[in-house]
Amino acid sequence: MFVFLQLQKRPEVRVANGCKSLIINNLKRKEMITNCCPAATALPTVPSETCAQNFGQIQKIIFQRIMNGSTKNSIADGTSAGNAGLLASWTALKTANDDTKIAVSPFIEAPADDGGDARTFGGGNDTLNGIEIIIGSNPVNFSCRLNGKKQDIIAELKKLMCESQANNLGVFLVNENGNIEGIKDGGSWYPIPVQKLFVGDKMHGNWDGPDYNNMSFSFVPGYSDKLDVLVLDASALAL
């Protein structure tokens, strides 16, 4: 009997400012197990806080492919025609027939995050002074419920799992005010990369509650470093 092993290409490793990062399917994943040596000339400058930022309740999710061919999908900031500040720009993307197309979830409920804590090694006699070493960060995991939804809607959402398996799926989040949360870099908005999207089969609520489907995915470590909130000219909940 012959056994054939498929060798996968190792992720590309880049080094900048003494810190390693992995390039996986065109996605940059920051690694906290950094060899930050030599040290920077001075400590970083932390911006002064002018006002708090809290996004609120996530009520809809906008899915989009991360890559548009060989370039990243992006929407220019601003309120000119086709720019991110106009609801019409997002509405047009719903009917696109290429990599720029967006798919919008129905209303979701019970949104919750967990994880995001440090991955550590050691403690006790294994490390100096018994202090654990931080070797990375666990992903932030997102979960929600789709209550009382027709299963033809769920069947279409399940197709997005294939996009996730290809590491080519991102999301924009929509809150109760119709604002959008995404990655803002320079003058453009980008979808937040996610992995491990799962859309579950129908669960019957029977006497005590509505029927529902579970949905979940994971953000990659460092996903929120350039996260920002976009206020449109009209509520994105209308998408």
Question: What is the predicted function of each stretch?
Answer:
Residues 66, 147-151, 174-177, 210, ...:
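Generic structural motif
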